[in-house]
């Protein structure tokens, strides 16, 4: 597997790369092989090679809603951060997989295009956002998603239309079929820039007031259980401020777990499990994780 550097001398490849550099929690073990394609063609080459040689392949976006275990990830990590182009086509925006959702929302603002205001504070990449149908404050990616270019796990390039991109709460066809997002097309609407800015300012203020942005975190840890709010259940269970190792249930918003210093992925997972157990015993409600947990135990 280490011969990928010989096989693809034109592609940036690192061995035994610490993944804590790429996650918002600042935790995670090492990647055996860490690949950073600069073009869609390079990404396609690597995906096809991994499929042909039965090498495990993991896609890494912005690392924002993700916990990578302390034992790291075997096989190849494909990091799409260098695919960041954002372009306008009439009232549509085409953003590549590695583009930040926040930057895409800002681009829409600069172009006086409305529809992505809800995304102005979501820290993920376009690829990750499509994968989990990211959303906030009443908006979801699927509301404005028109089309996507993806790679299958065999390296086949596919164009998906809106009708093929089924989505629900924190779910998408892309996740179901394990597609690799290369770009996304969003259909937006012309609007006065000052009105778009006002909406973004309102949402940013709400986010800053409620969320613990001063600490590393993976964002909202749990999905919203039917008929409940995860943060309220955790708070009413007396868990706000609870600490395991360097991980803490946020004092600002109980739906977040923050790294208050030196946390490991194991600390995060132990605290998540403790929260789930406590809420289950107290309220008979099962908290399902929204954050994605991947990798191997140490």
UniProtKB/Swiss-Prot annotation:
Q: Pathway, per UniProt?
A: Cell wall biogenesis; peptidoglycan biosynthesis
* One Pfam entry name: MurB_C
EC code(s) of this entry: 1.3.1.98
CC per GO annotation: cytosol
Q: Matching SUPFAM superfamilies, A to Z?
A: FAD-binding/transporter-associated domain-like, Uridine diphospho-N-Acetylenolpyruvylglucosamine reductase, MurB, C-terminal domain
Q: Name one GO molecular function term.
A: FAD binding
Enzyme class of the recorded protein, top EC level: oxidoreductase
List this protein's GO terms for biological process. Answer: cell division; cell wall organization; peptidoglycan biosynthetic process; regulation of cell shape
Q: Which cofactor does it need?
A: FAD
Q: What reaction is this protein's catalytic activity? A: UDP-N-acetyl-alpha-D-muramate + NADP(+) = UDP-N-acetyl-3-O-(1-carboxyvinyl)-alpha-D-glucosamine + NADPH + H(+)
Database matches in InterPro entries: FAD-bd_PCMH, FAD-bd_PCMH-like_sf, FAD-bd_PCMH_sub1, FAD-bd_PCMH_sub2, MurB, MurB_C, MurB_C_sf, Oxid_FAD_bind_N
Active-site residues, as the UniProt record annotates them: 170, 220, 290
Annotated FAD-binding PCMH-type domain ranges read 27-191
Q: Where in the cell is it found?
A: Cytoplasm
Q: What does this protein do?
A: Cell wall formation.
Identify this protein by name: UDP-N-acetylenolpyruvoylglucosamine reductase
Q: Which organism is it from?
A: Listeria monocytogenes serotype 4a (strain HCC23)
* Gene expressing this chain: murB
């Amino acid at each position: 597997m280490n011969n990928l550097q010989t096989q693809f001398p034109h592609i940036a490849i690192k061995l035994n790369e610490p993944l804590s550099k790429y996650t918002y929690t600042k935790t995670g073990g090492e990647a055996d092989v860490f690949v950073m394609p600069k073009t869609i063609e390079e990404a396609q080459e690597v995906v096809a090679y991994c499929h042909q040689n039965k090498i495990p392949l993991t896609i890494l976006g912005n690392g924002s809603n993700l916990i990578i275990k302390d034992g790291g990830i075997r096989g190849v990590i494909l990091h799409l951060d260098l695919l960041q182009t954002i372009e306008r086509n009439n009232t549509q925006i085409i953003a590549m997989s590695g583009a930040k959702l926040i930057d895409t929302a800002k681009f829409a603002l600069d172009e006086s295009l409305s529809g992505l205001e809800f995304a102005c504070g979501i820290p993920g990449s376009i690829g990750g956002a499509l994968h989990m149908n990211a959303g906030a404050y009443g908006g979801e990616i699927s509301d404005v998603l028109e089309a996507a270019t993806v790679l299958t796990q065999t390296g086949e390039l596919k164009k998906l239309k809106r009708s093929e991109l089924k989505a629900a709460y924190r779910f998408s066809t892309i996740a179901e079929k394990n597609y690799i997002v290369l770009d996304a097309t969003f259909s937006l609407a012309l609007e006065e820039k000052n009105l778009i800015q006002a909406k973004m300012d309102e949402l940013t203020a709400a986010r800053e007031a409620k969320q613990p942005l001063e600490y590393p975190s993976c964002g909202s840890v749990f999905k919203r259980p039917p008929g409940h709010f995860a943060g309220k259940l955790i708070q009413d269970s007396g868990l706000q401020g609870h600490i395991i190792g360097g991980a803490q249930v946020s004092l600002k918003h109980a739906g977040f777990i923050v790294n208050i210093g030196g946390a490991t992925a194991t600390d995060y997972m132990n605290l998540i499990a403790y929260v789930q157990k406590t809420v289950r015993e107290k309220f008979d409600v099962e908290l399902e994780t929204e954050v994605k947990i991947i990798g191997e135990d140490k």
